[in-house]
Amino acid sequence: MATTVTCTRFTDEYQLYEDIGKGAFSVVRRCVKLCTGHEYAAKIINTKKLSARDHQKLEREARICRLLKHSNIVRLHDSISEEGFHYLVFDLVTGGELFEDIVAREYYSEADASHCIQQILEAVLHCHQMGVVHRDLKPENLLLASKCKGAAVKLADFGLAIEVQGDQQAWFGFAGTPGYLSPEVLRKEAYGKPVDIWACGVILYILLVGYPPFWDEDQHKLYQQIKAGAYDFPSPEWDTVTPEAKNLINQMLTINPAKRITAHEALKHPWVCQRSTVASMMHRQETVECLKKFNARRKLKGAILTTMLATRNFSVGRQTTAPATMSTAASGTTMGLVEQAKSLLNKKADGVKPQTNSTKNSSAITSPKGSLPPAALEPQTTVIHNPVDGIKESSDSTNTTIEDEDAKARKQEIIKTTEQLIEAVNNGDFEAYAKICDPGLTSFEPEALGNLVEGMDFHRFYFENLLAKNSKPIHTTILNPHVHVIGEDAACIAYIRLTQYIDGQGRPRTSQSEETRVWHRPDGKWQNVHFHCSGAPVAPLQ
C-alpha cells in the first residue's frame, strides 16, 4: 500500500521571522533561505479555508507571477505547497509606498514624476508582452525596492491579474478599484490591456498635482464622470505643468480603448524618453502638500468606514411615513459621526478647509485641491488591500478594489437576506423569521441580559406578545453593512441598525443597535445560525 509523502520543502529550506502583513486567508512573514542567507517575503495561505474557486485564483496568481521577471515588478521566487498551507516566496521590498516616499522628498519635479511613470510603464509593458493584464493599478500597489535614494519602483499585487491572448478583448468580470476603473469596464464591455493604461493616466495625473482626475462622494456620479472622460486641468496648479505632460495624460485617458495609447507608445512619448529637455525641473511644493493630504485620507480609510453612512437605506413593516426618511434624532446622530470623521481627517491632513461656496449640504466634503470627498479619500477596494500581501480586504470605499462578480453577488445576497430577516421582525411574522433562521440559532442580545440563548422559543415570545400586536409604523435603516465571505457557504455580516418607531405616548423614537450575524448555506439556502446584538433592544419595548 502506497504511503502519501507530505511535502516539507518550505519548512526545510526557509526560516520564518516576523509578520509584515495580513490578509483574509493569509499572512506575510519575513523569511530567510537557509542555504544562502537571502531575505524574502513569504505569503502564507491557509489552504484549509479556501473554496475550490479560491484555489483556482491562487493557482492563477502563482502562474502569472512565475511568468513575470522584471526589475520593476515584485518577483515570485518560489511557490511551495505543504499540508494545509501554500507558500509564495516574493522579493522582500522594504522601501514602502512610492507615494509616501514622494512626500518625504525635499525636491520633487515633473521630471521626477516622469521617471516614476516610466518605471510603472516598463512594468506594465512587460506584463502586456507576457499576456498579463494587472487590472488593479493604484498607488497602494506601487512600492519601492528599498529606502535608498533612487530605489526602483516595484509593481505588486497580482491577485486580480488575468491572462489574455495578444490583443484579445473580452468580458473578464467587474474588477478593479473605483477611481481607477476604465470606461469600458464600467460599461461592462469587452476589455483588455488598455484598462491598465487608463489607470496609469489616473496615477500620472495624481503624481503631477496630488489629487485624482475623477472624484465624487456619490459613486454613481464618479462612474458617470469616468464614462464621460470628464476631467480637466484647472488653474493655477496645472498652469505650471508642461503641455507635453498634459498631452500624455490625454492620450492615456482616451475613452475609446482602441485609440488609447499603448505602454510601448507611451514609453516613446517625448515627456518620458526625453525628460531632461521636455519635463519641467521646477520644484512642485503644492503637489507635495496635496499628495500629503491625499495619502493621509487613504490611511484613514478605517475611520471613515466606521462613521460614514452606507448607501443601503430601506423601509420595512407597516410604514405610514415617507419611504426611506430619517427621524431628526437618527439624522443628527449620523451627521454627528460624519462631522467627527471630517474633523479627524482635517486634523490629520494639516488643516484642509472645505470649500465654502458649495451648494451641497454641510456633510459633503468638496474641492479637489482641499478637502477631497469620500470617493477620493482612499487609496483606490478590494474592499481588501494589504500593500505587502496583495490580499484584498473588505470595505465599502471608493478607493477599494472591487472583487470579482461572484464574491460581490454573494455579499449582496447576504445583505438582502438580512433585510428580509429584519422585515420579518418588523412585521411580527414569526413564520417568515423561522424560515430564515436555523432551528438551533444561538444569540447574545440585550433582552437575554447577556446570556447565550439557543433555539427559537425565546424569540417566539417577543413575536407573539409584542411584535405581532404592534400596529404602529416601524422604519429600519441599516448603516455600513460589512460582509465577510467565509468560503463558499458561510458569511458574516456586521452593521449598525437604526429602528424608528412610535412609543406608547405617540412620540417618535429611535433606537440603535450594533449587530453581527453569521450565515450558513447548508442546502443552497442561507440560514442565520448566530447573531450578536449590542446597544438598545432590537424590539422597541416602550
Curated annotation (Swiss-Prot):
Record note on what altering K43R does: Catalytically inactive form
Region ranges (Calmodulin-binding): 291-301
Region described as Disordered: 349-376
Segments traversing the membrane: none
Location of region: Autoinhibitory domain: 283-292
Function, as annotated: Calcium/calmodulin-dependent protein kinase that functions autonomously after Ca(2+)/calmodulin-binding and autophosphorylation, and is involved in dendritic spine and synapse formation, neuronal plasticity and regulation of sarcoplasmic reticulum Ca(2+) transport in skeletal muscle. In neurons, plays an essential structural role in the reorganization of the actin cytoskeleton during plasticity by binding and bundling actin filaments in a kinase-independent manner.
Full protein name: Calcium/calmodulin-dependent protein kinase type II subunit beta
Gene designation: Camk2b
